[in-house]
Curated annotation (Swiss-Prot):
Domain of life: Bacteria
Family according to the record: Belongs to the TrpF family.
Record bears the keyword Amino-acid biosynthesis: yes
The keyword Amino-acid biosynthesis is annotated on this UniProt entry: yes
CDD domains per the UniProt record, alphabetical: PRAI (cd00405)
Gene (name only): trpF
The protein, known as: N-(5'-phosphoribosyl)anthranilate isomerase
Organism lineage string: Bacteria, Pseudomonadati, Pseudomonadota, Alphaproteobacteria, Caulobacterales
One example GO MF annotation: phosphoribosylanthranilate isomerase activity
Keywords attached to this entry: Amino-acid biosynthesis, Aromatic amino acid biosynthesis, Isomerase, Tryptophan biosynthesis
Length: 213
């Protein structure tokens, strides 16, 4: 069964829609250049109602320093920390040990060689994530709506289930899963009515589409 992560949540109604729709993961962004950026205290308030829920909370970061990791663990207490920058295997190991949380390592993909880079992290992290490489000059490493050739993931096997991300929405997620074979999917801009503005109806539609895969 394919599982979904709804990323970039910032309002209670969006969180509620994600959980009610059956999302396995909910993500909160901590990156100042993103329209979805939150402070850890605000995220902690949003996830307070989820402690009795099986949904896993994810703190999405870009090259986080130790101070941010410590602040996240003191406030939001995420189940997983997603790193979406230039983190090395050594740094990823440090983040995992310092936080005690699982780590999702994201990769920007435009070719098979980009997928190959994940091998150095396989077995080191809880999940790998393959996202579209942003256009040149973009300040955001993800959440841009860009896609890559989903078939680059077809036949790839990793020690833990991996995520497909980048340009997914309620209308193409079934095709994306079929083309990639990915067991996990991640969506952000594809369920928004504007930059950073999640639409609960689109969240529900996306999760319904995933259930039909």
């Amino acid at each position: 069964m394919v599982q979904a992560k709804i990323c970039g949540l910032s309002t209670l109604d969006a969180v509620t829609a994600a959980v009610a729709g059956g999302a396995a993961f909910v993500g909160f962004v901590f990156f100042e250049k993103s329209p979805r950026n939150l402070d850890p205290e605000a995220a902690a308030r949003l996830v307070a109602s989820l402690r009795q829920s099986p949904v896993k909370t994810v703190a999405v970061t870009v090259d986080p320093d130790d101070a941010l990791i410590d602040r996240l663990m003191a406030t939001m207490k995420p189940d997983l920390i997603q790193v979406h920058g230039r983190e090395t295997p050594s740094r990823v190991r440090q983040i995992a040990e310092r936080s005690g949380a699982g780590v999702i390592k994201a990769f920007s993909v435009s070719s098979a060689a980009d997928v190959d880079q994940a091998g150095a992290f396989d077995g080191l992290v809880e999940h790998l994530m393959f996202d579209a490489r942003p256009v040149e000059g973009s300040v955001l490493p993800g959440g841009t709506g860009a896609r890559f050739d989903w078939s680059l993931l077809q036949g790839r096997r990793f020690s833990r289930p991996h995520f497909l991300a980048g340009g997914l929405d309620p209308w193409n997620v079934a095709e994306a899963v079929k083309a990639s074979g990915a067991p996990l999917v991640d969506v952000s801009s594809g369920v928004e009515r504007g930059p950073g503005l999640k639409d609960p109806a689109l969240i529900t539609a996306f999760l319904d589409a995933v259930k039909r895969v």
